[in-house]
Every structure is written in structure tokens, then in C-alpha cells.
A protein has these predicted regions:
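Short, surface-exposed loop or secondary-structure junction motifs
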Residues: 43-304
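Short, well-ordered beta-strand elements
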Residues: 320-321, 327-336
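Generic C-terminus detector
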Residues: 335-358
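Short, surface-exposed beta-strand/loop micro-motifs that present aromatic residues
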Residues: 309, 316-325
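Structural preference for long, well-ordered alpha-helical segments in enzyme cores
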Residues: 18, 146-149, 348
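Short, conserved catalytic-motif segment at the N-terminal edge
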Residues: 1-6, 26-28, 42-52, 342, ...
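Active-site SXXK
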Residues: 5-33, 37, 41, 127-135, ...
Length: 358
């Protein structure tokens, strides 16, 4: 019953919330985002020079672009260009505890896009903007909508944007590698030395001082949820069941089937859409559906898995995938930052699939 930071595994939950609104007729996937968030109507596009070297959007950012990370938005932690730096300076890197999503989105929309909408795949705060759209479409704060339409119906009792005081003792600490240490060498002895190397991990965030202990008013649809493996397992089982669990219908069967199709232009993989410095998956042979990656070609992806498997992960090395062909869902939770520290996802996938013998 340990509670962990699921970070970007929040994105799939937020996308399901948006698709609930879609089924209710609130929007169409190719609607301009600016129709609902007018601040994005005049958001310029960076041309590659100084921050003010910009041009107008040639076509508008759409809701589909947000769900597929082809919106032109970015993350400040990429640290690859002046737009990333502007995100950090404006406090856009990760929604914090103060203010509201509406205020945060207005600050974001004042900064340039890194490319024309639809032109590139770039990991970004798109799901946070999508969370704000859920608020606009539903007329409810994102936390209230998630609780009423996903968390409560699925009995995800320990999932939310903060950990209740009664559960503070269940919140895990989060760790990171020490500078220069390799996870492969933790506890090993250096050649010619009888002394083990120093531990390869340090405390990244103690549970006693975690920001997730305090309530927030700024609900990050891209990375703000905490929860348990039981809770997220129920969410994945709902997806595997094509929208239903224990009599609770969250989405229609055809909606879930549509979400897990590759939505990138011309059925391209992520490698063909650009390769940013950060992703929760590899690029070759991997497309992107609505809210998660989708395996197009296992050989190109260099993974012993099924075409059609869909997945995502979180910054603290958490991961999930759903394989409709094999009728399995997998959830793995740990607390190790960043997710590139150790190739646990690749090893876990090999362990799971080698166990399928009939």
C-alpha cells in the first residue's frame, strides 16, 4: 500500500478524462486549442535564433496535438534552447502548489512554441494544458473531475494530487544516483581495492518534506498524481477491458480502441517526427496514440513485445504497459530519479514476456 509519485503516468489519466469529455460532445480532436483557451490564439513560433526571433503559427494547435505531444510546447528541463530556458525563468517547468491552472496556462501561452504545431514530436507540458481544457469543458477543477469520473468509479482510493495526512507515513522516499556513480557498480569493489565503492544512491526527496504532502490548487495533468500500484493496476485493467472495470464504464469500447491507434501523421514513428533529448520510450518503431506510446514494429523498436502494445512511464522510473494481443497489463513502481538511471523497463519487459509459454 506504499504511495509513490507517478509523475508522467498522470498523463494517461488526464487523457482518459479528456476523452470522457469527448464522448460527451464537448470538443472534436482537431478543434483549435484557442477556441477554448483564447490565450493560445496568438502564441508565436520560435524560428531558431533569439527568443524574439518568431513567426506566426501556420496552422493552429489542436487538441489532438496536445494528446500526441506534437503541439510545439516543450519542457524547461530539456535545456536545449532558449525557449526551454524561458520556461524555467517563467516557472513553467512544473506546475507548483500556488495559483491555478488557468493562470499557469496564460503564462505558458505568452512564450513561443519551439516548432509549428504538428511538425515535430516533442515531450512537453501538453498534458497540463489538456488538464486545463478538462476544467473548461466540465466546469470543474481537474481534481474534482478526476475523482468523480475516474478515481471513485475505479476505487482508486489512494490516488490524488496530494497525500492526505493520515497517509503521510505511506509515502515513499525518492532517490537519485550520486554524482558520477553507476547503478551497475552499487556496492561493488573497485579493481584492486578491498573497499566497496560508496553507495550509488542519494536521497532525492524525503517523504517527510515532500511537496506532495500539502494540498495544491494547481493540478498538474502531466505529472501531479500520487498513488499505489493497486490503484494504477485498476486503471490499466480498465484500459485492458476497453473502458470498463467491475461494472464501472469509464469510456466506450471503441473510444479506447481508437486511443491506442497511432495518431502521428502518415502513421510515422516518433523517430520520423524528431528525437528530443527526453522521452519515456525509445523512438524507432514506436508511434503515439492519445496519451501514450504505441508499438508499431517490435523489430524496429528492438523489443520482444507485441505490435499494438501501449505504454508510458514516469520520471521516478515508474512504468506501465498494456498488451491487448496477449491480454496483459503491467505496472511497475519504484522511486528512482531520473527514469534513465537504470534500464529496468527493458529488463522487466524481457522477464514478463519470457514467462508467456502458451
Amino acid at each position: 500500500d506504499t504511495i509513490v509519485r507517478i509523475y508522467s503516468m498522470t498523463k494517461a489519466v488526464t487523457t482518459v478524462a479528456a476523452m470522457i469529455c469527448y464522448e460527451q460532445g464537448c470538443f472534436q480532436l482537431d478543434d483549435p486549442v484557442a477556441r477554448y483557451l483564447p490565450a493560445f490564439a496568438d502564441t508565436p513560433v520560435w524560428r531558431g535564433g533569439a527568443l524574439d526571433d518568431v513567426e506566426s503559427q501556420t496552422s493552429p494547435m489542436t487538441v489532438r496535438h496536445l494528446m500526441t505531444h506534437t503541439s510545439g510546447l516543450t519542457y524547461g528541463f530539456m535545456q536545449t534552447n532558449v525557449v526551454d530556458a524561458a520556461y524555467r525563468a517563467a516557472g513553467i517547468e512544473f506546475p507548483g502548489a500556488g495559483g491555478t491552472l488557468a493562470e499557469w496556462v496564460d503564462r505558458l501561452a505568452a512564450l513561443p512554441l519551439i516548432c509549428q504545431p504538428g511538425a515535430q514530436w516533442n515531450y512537453s507540458v501538453s498534458s497540463d494544458v489538456l488538464g486545463r481544457l478538462v476544467e473548461v469543458w466540465s466546469g470543474q477543477p481537474l481534481d474534482v473531475f478526476l475523482q468523480a469520473n475516474i478515481l471513485a468509479p475505479l476505487a482508486m482510493r489512494d490516488t490524488g494530487f496530494h497525500v492526505a495526512p493520515a497517509n503521510h507515513g505511506r509515502l515513499a522516499a525518492c532517490y537519485a544516483p550520486t554524482s558520477g556513480a553507476s547503478m551497475a557498480n552499487v556496492g561493488a569493489r573497485a579493481k584492486g581495492s578491498a573497499t566497496p565503492r560508496p553507495p550509488g544512491l542519494k536521497l532525492q526527496e524525503a517523504s517527510a518534506v515532500s511537496r506532495f504532502r500539502a494540498p495544491t490548487t494547481l493540478f498538474s495533468g502531466g505529472g501531479g498524481l500520487t498513488g499505489t500500484i493497486t490503484d494504477y493496476g485498476r486503471f490499466c485493467q480498465m484500459l485492458l477491458n476497453r473502458g470498463e472495470l467491475d461494472g464501472a464504464r469509464i469510456l466506450g469500447r471503441k473510444t479506447v480502441e481508437f486511443m491506442r491507434l497511432n495518431q502521428l501523421p502518415d502513421n510515422r514513428d516518433m523517430a520520423a517526427m524528431g528525437q528530443p533529448v527526453w522521452s519515456e520510450t525509445s523512438y524507432e518503431g514506436i508511434g503515439f496514440g492519445l496519451g501514450f506510446s504505441v508499438v508499431l514494429d517490435p523489430a524496429a523498436a528492438k523489443a520482444a513485445c507485441s505490435a499494438g502494445e501501449y505504454a508510458w512511464g514516469g520520471a521516478a522510473s515508474t512504468a506501465f504497459w498494456v498488451d491487448p494481443m496477449e491480454d496483459i497489463g503491467v505496472v511497475f513502481l519504484t522511486q528512482l530519479m531520473p527514469s534513465s538511471t537504470y534500464p529496468i523497463r527493458r529488463e522487466l519487459r524481457a522477464l514478463v514476456y519470457q514467462g508467456l509459454i502458451d
